[in-house]
């Protein structure tokens, strides 16, 4: 048996939307798969997200409270999850998003045989679609955190008609197709019996009302494409491909419903000096042959400034040094990963006579066989 949504978020049944949102944020911080060590974190995160989506939607919450948890879950399965859309691309319209999920009124009617809430279909408050876009940042910004300006073109409610799709005071009439209900009903005879299906009225598009003129600005759509400039807070430690959510910055809702959210996929640019692996960083540092033989103190760059590293005598090319705590910050957690510095002994491409003579004497005095040293990843693994 699945858990009650109020219990999942730890709120009372009369909790306000703000209280539910705050409870969800706390659960998200605790159980987000990127930050939690709990083996069941992903499932708990999904449960909290589902609970928030239902309890912050006025219509869904009303149905949930009326039906109870188990019957609501059954009705949802029976109704299915309608809609859905692809991801937005980098060219053209940068946004994508789902159609906003299932119609709870239809599910309620199917489950109880049409005894749901009356009124026109167009009067229901619906949350707007979530929108998706991308934002590129530097590795330094991922390390330190940053405030970025994001310019987007997104659908917004038309100011001229206040999102209604028709001018104020336009003459109207009840839609004769659906008799003002916003939905039409079709009955089909199947081997299992008669099946009743309700669909949005095509003639009035679910409004239940026909108007003699449409808004010239939005052409009756109720929304227009506008440019918006948003400030995005980039948390330190964010990784390439992770998504930030800006609540209520998505597409406008219908009939006074809340806006959807804006989902921002973060893309971290490659860095010339560092390669990232989770919370760890890798850096290759060139040293000279004498430094490798006799040892030296070298200066190594980090994302937090330069540090000095002692290279012991006899260091081999490809050897890895671990600088604890010099890697990436752990997202929404304390501490940093490590920086792994792989030294590469540089072979000189030109020698003067004195250098050649010294090396020849060195070679004659040696006589030892040289083994091929283990690779970078083997050294990295063995250093852990």
Curated annotation (Swiss-Prot):
Residues that coordinate or bind Zn(2+) 1: 158, 161, 215, 218
Residues annotated as binding Zn(2+) 2: 175, 178, 201, 204
Main location as per UniProt: cytoplasm
Gene Ontology terms describing biological process: chaperone cofactor-dependent protein refolding; DNA replication; protein refolding; response to heat
Cofactor(s) the protein requires to work: Zn(2+)
Zinc finger (CR-type) stretch: 145-227
Ranges of Gly residues composition bias in the record: 80-101, 112-121
Protein name in the entry: Chaperone protein DnaJ
Lineage: Archaea, Methanobacteriati, Methanobacteriota, Stenosarchaea group, Halobacteria
